[in-house]
């Protein structure tokens, strides 16, 4: 026989500090949120981007997590088998820098932070399954980073090359292009330098075209646009010009303007620059190339002043006319786009026009507005598509896209051009010269070169006793013993690669590892692949062209490796906004506008903080923190408590019937369900608050104590559970529930009860609202106006006055105009 549960006496007033720790401990003890696969249920994999273990969850973490938690709880109550894991993105520079500052090993600092943040997450009251938790700094995790790297290497997707890279002088490490924002390090804000280094890259460009296909993932339009722009597909032609240093191929999206090309421009880094530079120009070119090398690509593209450049002294031969055109070097041309050289058409390109005006170069019109007169393109370029002119056999053809194919075909027949598609996307630079990251699993043999570490020797663990002060070279180079290795081909001595991987490698596939976080045979157990893809992924839009693009690339490689059948890691992505400081600025310690959620929980309880963060603003937009705003949700939850447990409701008796109450309950239930579908959390809270007002009135009406009243309390309790899980659980158990409210089914909408044959509309007198009337939805204009005239609050403003006009907008408004 089951022992009856011993309950403590119920508190008369709502006390979250007594309720919340009790239920958090109980849920954990009972394993309420532990995921178990159940083929009889439809799976729902819900995932929120995992945090960096900085030491404390800030209010932004709460904002990012509580709304998706409510959504996951709602899905579970609807009968879905919800998988909702969480872990920690634990490698990276902040841990290394903090460890340097405090004289700790990064592993010690990170582990302590994870332990603290885990407790904070639990006090948030989430339904996270912590049995699947992971930390990317654990060797059992980064072993698979290394395994993937070796597999990418074998497939030709990981390679090493020399080249100009972005260098952060403060963090003393290389940055990927995506980590440079406005010429500065994304993390620390330091101006970025350019250095020539040998680095490892992943060949994301092999998947550029496929990454432009979003058919298998539901992403916000803004994210799709950002990724599309970053990939930067351009369709055009490669055209070859003869030069003294051999043929030079340029890429253009406007082959229709070829006859207007009056000079070539090469990037300062272009390998032909030395050979094309004449002795007379050698010193000027050398100085210019050196100066350009001190600028980042972003700075070169964004400079608003006069164009700069230098003449090489050499000329190219125009492939059609045979004319000699000068070859220049200018830093507005990038080696990383196209071929690193352009044909300049100053009459029809703004940058080329500015350059030609600056240096007195020829400007030749070859495109004219359709039906228009010749333009003075020496004063301003014409960049429209127009009609081709001054171009021999091409004259009269439409400019732009319409003529690309026939013009390329003709140039191809002449042997000077071919069709070409290019992408702005560059391969992903993954080498980092810091300690706290995944060691790159490559050894270097004098006889066999770079060789991947065999799978049975993984993980290559980080050495523990290393001096990791930033010096510009990897700290791993300081551990000579760790560097010693054996060549897997010949068994001879070899040396380890001493760089570590970009931490975005860690987060590119972590959503798969949750399926079996302790599996030592596979990155993830294929037996659990039925949980894929992630059904709902949530996080900040700031990751649009970093993490979100890299994870899509990683999934496509995994598919080609036979590890998954998915084309995309996420079926649906939604982004939350940002909670700003009270001053409307981004929260930061230096501004003194940081809100500590732990302080709020100590004062108000987790349920109040949860509901306020869902109520404060549309979730996808965010907004400024209002310190007084949290009092509203706090008072609301106290009213909810009183609704269930106070004997009487103060106030005059209300006239609410069963049909009225059931309409309020079921119409709210229907609205809340629709709002969960569109993730409109602020309107969910607003609807529940409004229903609370109705229930408080109903408690003072004849409907109190009836079956309709009991149904209302039951449904409201279950609607409350996803947003305020602790108070909802306490109410449920106090009302006799033997199982958790979080194991209950979401209530079914009674469509008949949720629909009314009548409608309540406002009545205006001379444009001002004076009352409301309830009329049939099919009422005629005369019936509606008669009801309005009879309303006592309306009659006070119409009696003794002349009626000028009466207006009835069916179902919307009545207006009686008097004088």
From Swiss-Prot:
Superkingdom of the organism of origin: Bacteria
Motif segment ('HIGH' region): 51-61
Pfam families attached to this UniProt entry: Anticodon_1, tRNA-synt_1, tRNA-synt_1_2
An MF annotation (GO) of this entry: aminoacyl-tRNA deacylase activity
UniProtKB keywords: Aminoacyl-tRNA synthetase, ATP-binding, Cytoplasm, Ligase, Nucleotide-binding, Protein biosynthesis
Location in or out of the cell: Cytoplasm
Subcellular location, principal: cytoplasm
EC numbers, comma separated: 6.1.1.4
Residues where ATP binds: 589
GO CC terms of this entry: cytosol
TM region positions: none
InterPro entries given in the database record: aa-tRNA-synth_Ia, Leu-tRNA-ligase, Leu_tRNA-synth_edit, M/V/L/I-tRNA-synth_anticd-bd, Rossmann-like_a/b/a_fold, tRNAsynth_Ia_anticodon-bd, Val/Leu/Ile-tRNA-synth_edit
GO biological process per UniProt: leucyl-tRNA aminoacylation
UniProt key word Coiled coil: no
Top class in the EC scheme: ligase
Reactions accelerated catalytically: tRNA(Leu) + L-leucine + ATP = L-leucyl-tRNA(Leu) + AMP + diphosphate
Motif ('KMSKS' region): 586-590
Entry coiled-coil feature ranges: none
Keyword Ligase among UniProt keywords: yes
Family the entry assigns: Belongs to the class-I aminoacyl-tRNA synthetase family.
Protein name (Swiss-Prot/TrEMBL): Leucine--tRNA ligase
Organism: Deinococcus geothermalis (strain DSM 11300 / CIP 105573 / AG-3a)
Lineage: Bacteria, Thermotogati, Deinococcota, Deinococci, Deinococcales
């Amino acid at each position: 026989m089951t022992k009856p549960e011993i309950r403590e006496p119920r508190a008369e007033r709502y006390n979250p500090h007594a309720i919340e720790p009790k239920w958090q401990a109980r849920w954990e003890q009972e394993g309420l949120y532990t995921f178990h696969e159940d083929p009889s249920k439809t799976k729902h994999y819900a995932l929120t981007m995992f945090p960096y273990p900085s030491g404390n969850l800030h209010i932004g973490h709460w904002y990012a997590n509580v709304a998706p938690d409510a959504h996951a709880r709602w899905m579970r109550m609807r009968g879905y088998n919800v998988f909702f894991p969480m872990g920690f993105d634990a490698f990276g520079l902040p841990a290394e820098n903090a460890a340097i500052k405090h004289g700790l090993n990064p592993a010690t600092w990170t582990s302590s932070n994870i332990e603290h943040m885990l407790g904070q997450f639990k006090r948030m009251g989430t339904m996270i399954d912590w049995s699947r938790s992971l930390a990317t700094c654990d060797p059992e995790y980064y072993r698979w980073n290394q395994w993937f790297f070796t597999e990418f290497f074998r497939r030709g997707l990981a390679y090493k090359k020399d080249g100009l890279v972005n260098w952060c002088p403060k963090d003393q490490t290389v940055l990927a292009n995506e980590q440079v924002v406005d010429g500065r390090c994304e993390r620390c804000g330091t101006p970025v330098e350019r250095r020539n280094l040998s680095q490892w890259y992943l060949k994301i460009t092999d998947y550029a075209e496929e990454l432009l296909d979003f058919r298998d993932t539901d992403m916000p339009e803004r994210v799709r646009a950002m990724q599309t722009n970053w990939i930067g597909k351009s369709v055009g032609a490669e055209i070859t010009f003869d030069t003294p240093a051999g043929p030079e191929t340029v890429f253009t999206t406007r082959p229709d303007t070829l006859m207007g090309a009056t000079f070539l421009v090469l990037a300062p880094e272009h390998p032909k620059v030395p050979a094309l530079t004449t002795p007379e120009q050698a010193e000027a070119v050398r100085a210019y190339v050196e100066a350009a090398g001190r600028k980042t690509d972003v700075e070169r593209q964004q400079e608003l002043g006069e164009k700069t450049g230098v003449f090489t002294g050499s000329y190219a031969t125009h492939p059609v006319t045979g004319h000699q055109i000068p070859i220049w070097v200018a830093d507005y041309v990038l080696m990383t786009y196209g071929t690193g050289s352009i044909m300049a058409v100053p009459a029809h390109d703004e940058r080329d026009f500015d350059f030609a005006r600056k240096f007195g170069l020829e400007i030749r019109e070859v495109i004219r507005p359709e039906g228009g007169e010749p333009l003075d393109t020496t004063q301003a370029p014409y960049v429209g598509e127009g009609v081709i002119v001054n171009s021999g056999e091409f004259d009269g053809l439409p400019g732009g896209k319409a003529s690309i194919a026939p013009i390329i075909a003709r140039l191809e027949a002449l042997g000077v051009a071919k069709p070409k598609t290019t992408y702005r996307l560059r391969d992903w630079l993954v080498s980092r010269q810091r300690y706290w990251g995944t060691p790159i699993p490559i050894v270097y043999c004098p006889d066999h070169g770079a060789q991947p570490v065999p799978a049975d020797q993984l993980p290559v663990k980080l050495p523990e006793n290393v001096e990791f002060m930033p010096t510009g070279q990897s700290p791993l180079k300081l551990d000579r013993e760790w560097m010693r290795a054996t060549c897997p081909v010949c068994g001879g001595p070899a040396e380890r690669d001493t760089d570590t991987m970009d931490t975005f490698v860690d987060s590119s596939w972590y959503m798969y590892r949750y399926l079996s976080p302790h599996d030592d045979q596979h990155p993830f157990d294929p037996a659990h692949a039925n949980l894929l893809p992630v059904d709902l992924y949530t996080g900040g839009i700031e990751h649009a062209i970093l993490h979100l693009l890299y994870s899509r690339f990683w999934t496509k490689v995994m598919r080609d490796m036979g590890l998954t059948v998915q084309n995309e890691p996420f079926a649906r992505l939604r982004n939350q906004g940002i909670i700003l400081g009270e001053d409307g600025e981004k929260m930061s310690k230096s501004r003194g506008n940081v809100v500590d959620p732990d302080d709020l929980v100590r004062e108000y309880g987790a349920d109040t903080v949860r509901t306020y963060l869902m109520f404060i603003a549309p979730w996808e937009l965010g907004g400024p923190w209002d310190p007084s705003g949290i009092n509203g949700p706090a008072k609301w939850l106290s009213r909810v408590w009183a609704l269930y447990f106070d004997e009487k409701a103060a106030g005059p008796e209300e006239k609410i019937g069963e049909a009225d109450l059931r309409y309020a309950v079921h119409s709210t239930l229907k609205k809340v369900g629709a709002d969960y579908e569109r993730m409109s959390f602020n309107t969910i809270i607003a609807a529940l608050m409004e229903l609370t007002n109705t229930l408080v009135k109903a408690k003072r009406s004849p409907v109190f104590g009836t079956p309709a009243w009991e149904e209302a309390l039951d449904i409201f309790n279950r609607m409350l559970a996803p947003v305020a899980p602790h108070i909802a659980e306490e109410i449920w158990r106090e009302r006799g529930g033997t199982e958790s409210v979080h194991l209950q089914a979401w209530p079914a909408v009674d469509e008949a009860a949720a629909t009314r044959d009548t409608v309540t509309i406002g009545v205006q007198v001379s444009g001002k609202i004076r009352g409301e009337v309830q009329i049939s939805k099919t009422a005629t204009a005369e019936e509606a106006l008669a009801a309005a005239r009879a309303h006592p609050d309306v009659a006070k403003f119409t009696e003794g006055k002349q009626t000028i006009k009466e207006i009835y907008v069916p179902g919307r408004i009545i207006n009686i105009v008097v004088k």
